[in-house]
């Protein structure tokens, strides 16, 4: 596998403490009686729609996640957005876990108490279309990719690497796509299983799914998380040196580190894997992951 990085960036840093247990002082706008009208909600890059839903319930903006998840699954209520319409018209759309996966932008939002699931979703898609600007669309077109394909690539980059390596991982993926190689990205397996395992088994790799990049050639069926603007940018502008030098492989290093090891040849890659694989197996074992 190309490896997976266990991100160590502390959420606290990213969220400025918005995820802390709710108190009226946590940046809420209140009425005269001290009750909040608006709540600040932080949704983290790399989270899935299910994690977004969980957070919205935890923050007391939604009473439960069922309606939110069902709207995100079908996406049909949001076809007025050009980006969503394109997905709804795409092949195998019925097999996407959530049509809107990757289309709800991670950010900190002011959300009215009493906002409906549908209103919240609209706000998040609007932000995605703002982040994926006309310049992004032009660049994607120049590269021969659709917005959906770039969001898919960006979502994989988001899950595979820390920000420092985004453009390098992007270069490896672009090089593999160009060479007609399978992407073989572990994070696409994690999306199917819901388990972040460092050392994948043969049965993991054989999972029958259009998201499984060990099985499908090219990109997975759709995005696997909500990518940050940085990951989108990396998908559009891969590291030029790594593209030119045709890097085709990367793997995780020590499980405690976000550092990746990049290789040009399979031989170099296999040498790196031989060094680090025992550490990954140990890491999974200590966490009771089979």
What are these regions (language model features)?
Residues 31-62, 71, 139-145:
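Glycine-rich loop/hinge motif
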Residues 65:
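Extracytoplasmic cell-surface/polysaccharide-interacting catalytic and binding patches
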Residues 68-74:
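Short, glycine-/polar-rich solvent-exposed loops and beta-turns at beta-strand/coil boundaries
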Residues 7-15, 34-39, 154, 170:
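Ser/Thr/Pro/Gly-biased, low-complexity, turn-/loop-rich segments
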Residues 10-26:
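Intrinsic, low-complexity N-terminal interaction/targeting segments
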Residues 57, 61-62, 76-290:
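Bacterial extracytoplasmic/cell-wall-associated proteins, especially those involved in peptidoglycan
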Residues 13, 74-76:
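Active-site "lid/cap" and pocket-lining segments within catalytic core domains
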Residues 1-6:
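Short, small-residue-biased leader/transition segments that mark boundaries at the very start
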